[in-house]
Amino acid sequence: MIVREPRVVSPYRALLAAVPVREDVVRVAGSETHVWTYEPPGGEEARVTVVAVHGFRGDHHGLEPVVAHLTGVRVVMPDLPGFGESTPLDGEHSVAAYAAWLTELVAALGLGPDVVVLGHSFGSIVASAAVAGGLRASRLVLVNPIAAPALSGPRGVLTQLAVAYYKAGAALPEAAGQSVLRNAGVVRITSLAMVKTHDRELRRWIHDQHDSYFSRFADRRVVLDAFRASVSSDVSTYAADVGVPTLLVAADRDDITALPAQHVLQGLFPDARLVVVEGVGHLIHYEKPREAAAAIEEFLA
């Protein structure tokens, strides 16, 4: 795993610095899973606990800006197995395997049925699959949910290029494949394709976040497994079986899932609310964390 420390100071650093956090390690499904628990600042008592699942190729750092804007909420945030600090699962890294891991993790942490499950991007698929499959939770929150197959999104051609890129990474010898899959130029192109803000400093920070954390996967097998999982399933597969109130926090400029698909997805859940954040794409957690946190707090009130 390549480790590159961030070089650009977070615009949310002051808020995040006030949040007490601890790191624990729990062995789940063969993975030494690293888990960060963020408590409300100032000794405030948490009124609810949220377990948050980050997106593809990310780690727990990605959702920290949202955490920093929440009040009265305890957030428990693991690195997905095979990404960040967590070691891989024993077997394949499929949606089903990740959902089973999440269910087991929640039980291992002793979190009861009042827990709220949150997922961003690929994490929205994992979270939905877990809750639909029996993870006991009181509510479900999906940020930038993958509402439809990625190949059918507004920029499906980019997904097709990504498929070709990962196929190339799989076909090459191990060392060469690893190099291709961690290529800094490709990471930057991906970041440029997703960012929407015109704020130069915020853009610099977002690119630095991707440069720092987007290649912290354990090995080629893990990232290829997870990519196949991310493009072979979506939240709509599981929506009808989610029996708890659900919040969809979508973006009007998301290139992965078009807004009309989010409205369709809302109708597939037995009980779902849709909040649309304007002027942002697939990076709500980086560009509009305050708005995301406000929607989440209103939903949990």
What are the functions of these language-model segments?
Residues 34-85:
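Conserved HGGG/HGGXW glycine-rich cap/lid loop of the alpha/beta-hydrolase fold
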Residues 124-135, 140:
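Short glycine-enriched nucleophile-adjacent loop
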